[in-house]
């Protein structure tokens, strides 16, 4: 039986003591290999509750090795079964809060590019108690998809701070990506930012600004360079 098969068997029976014992028996080289196997082959096969329970135990065993396993959340996000309202998520948050609080934001940074809906992102922030809007913006900037641009815009509207808005724009401009540039155009128009060191082709009329974040589809419509449907 391979190490992967043994791991899958132990996880399937929720034998966490046996899992810990096995991981402790691995050499440094084997543990590094197991980190990849867990992230790429084992965790992506687990249903929501077992996913979070497994992640809790392996991060508790060795945070530095297994924290990145959270990126395997993508299969749950994609099929719509992702749920942060579980006891294992609560316990994982408490464990990180006590042992290494900065890992909470690190984990969110790795997770947010894999999420596919506003509800999922909101659930992540609530479950891991990321309550400060500026911190949320920093996390959202780790993703490079339309959903993150939409939530960045909504968060900036909520806090209404031109300095923060400009910093977000500068971060997006560095991507040299058409979608990111159009997101900057929206932020620039809403906040009246006139000193950004870049040229933009998308123009937004003032009367259109109140419609941009009406819903995600409308926002994406504008990101594509189209006029919002009013």
Predicted segments, located by residue:
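Terminal, non-catalytic domain-edge segments
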Residues: 209-230
């Amino acid at each position: 039986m391979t190490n992967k098969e043994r791991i899958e068997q132990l996880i399937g029976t929720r034998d966490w003591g046996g899992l810990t014992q096995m991981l402790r028996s691995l050499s440094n080289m084997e543990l590094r290999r197991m980190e990849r196997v867990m992230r790429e082959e084992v965790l992506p096969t687990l249903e929501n509750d077992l996913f979070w329970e497994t992640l809790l135990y392996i991060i508790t065993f060795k945070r530095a090795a297994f924290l990145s396993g959270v990126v395997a959340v993508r299969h749950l996000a994609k099929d719509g079964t992702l749920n942060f309202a579980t006891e294992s998520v609560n316990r994982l948050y408490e464990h990180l809060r006590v042992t290494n609080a900065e890992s909470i934001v690190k984990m969110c940074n790795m997770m947010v590019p894999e999420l596919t809906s506003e509800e999922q992102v909101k659930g992540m922030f609530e479950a891991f108690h990321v309550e400060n809007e500026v911190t949320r913006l920093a996390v959202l900037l780790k993703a490079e998809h339309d959903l993150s641009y939409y939530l960045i815009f909504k968060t900036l509207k909520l806090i209404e701070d031109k300095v923060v808005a400009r910093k977000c724009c500068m971060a997006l401009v560095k991507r040299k990506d058409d979608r990111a540039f159009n997101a900057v155009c929206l932020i620039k128009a809403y906040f009246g930012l006139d000193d950004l060191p870049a040229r933009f082709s998308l123009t937004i009329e003032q009367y259109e600004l109140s419609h941009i974040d009406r819903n995600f589809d409308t926002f994406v419509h504008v990101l594509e360079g189209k006029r919002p449907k009013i």
